[in-house]
Amino acid sequence: MKTNARTVALATLMKVINQGSYSNISLNHALKAAKLPGEESRLATNLVYGTIQYQLYLEYQLKDLVKARLREPYIKPLLLMSAYQIFFLDKVPNRAVLDEANKLAKAYGRPKSSGYRLVNGILHSLLRRGEVLPEKDAPDYLSVKCSMPLWLSDYFVANWGKSRAEKIMASFNSKAKNEIRISALADEKRVVRDLDRAHFAPQESPLASRSYALSRGGIVMTDFFKDGEVTVQDEAASLVAEAFDFKGNEQALDACSAPGGKTIQIAEQLPDGQVTALDIHEKKLRLVKENAARMRVADRVKVKALDARKAREYFSRQEFDKILIDAPCSGLGLLRRKPEIRYTKTAEDISHLAEIQLDILNEVSGLLKKGGELVYSTCSISVEENEENVRKFLAAHPDFALKPFETAKISAPKGMLKILPDSYNSDGFFIAKFTTRG
């Protein structure tokens, strides 16, 4: 069967659903290999992310129609992908969905397999019956409607109330923006003008400076990206480095740096300083170095393979003017870009990660100079990983205090900022800024 959007999407979904692969990595590899034209590439991307985002909802639609065990590995992903098109892609006729599903089933099925008849029968039944949902007062109504595991749906409701929780979950099921940040070393006005001429139609972020949403993908294949004028970075993530007050000659530490987006953003502000980038994995630090070279700040970045929880075994106390702890987290703010997280993470994972984050905070904070600045951030919106960790850290370190901060477009008068995904249609993020007392 000829390679097209649906073959690429199905192959990717088989890896994600059956093997637990990361959707973004698997899809990027598949798209590079397939070299699809723009429209086909966009459809493949939509099919992969949409199917995973709505997987729980789609499984609920299919569960009463699947009477036999789905033995062949392509059948479940194909049914889910087809159901996604039926319920969410109005521009794709149902007849086309059925025809393409039959072609894929015959192409992927074993010789003499009747899998395609099974797929065809289930999809016809789905079309006849239509959508089903739990009763509105049922405990799992929001879970199914918003395609979130019940524990996570309940968690959002418990923390933000039913109305806001539903908006947050709906935002997580929307399409992620194609966001870039223009290097501080590049002429912003010229780059914006050139991006517009290249038909990327950049729209300025209301949240972060030098951040823009593009009307289409493919920026990484252009000279804008290759020459280090822009990098791919969500607007909420771009806010983290903006929380610092740089003079330009500081010694900075990025304690959890890979893949290096924030390391580079810090380095751009240090013409006479340096940022030391840590990561526990040597392989990931190679990516940091590659990105620093591409963005023309390699001379300002030094890397070290080290577990941040052992930082004081290697560095001297009060060695750094600025410290960033962009801590490993549950990724609950990234459910739009990494939709499978909702199905793989648990409440226990959040608790475990919160402990690791606090360990890093406790360890690395001892490396901050008196009067220096420490920024703690996560790409999670959980209370345990954010506000609760801040409370615990301050209770254990009376020599530290939260420090109000203001970026070019937003302020945090209490020293903490939580960006919920429905506020700006961005990733969810948390930032807290500390300084030492006295």
Describe each PLM feature range.
Residues 1-438:
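S-adenosylmethionine
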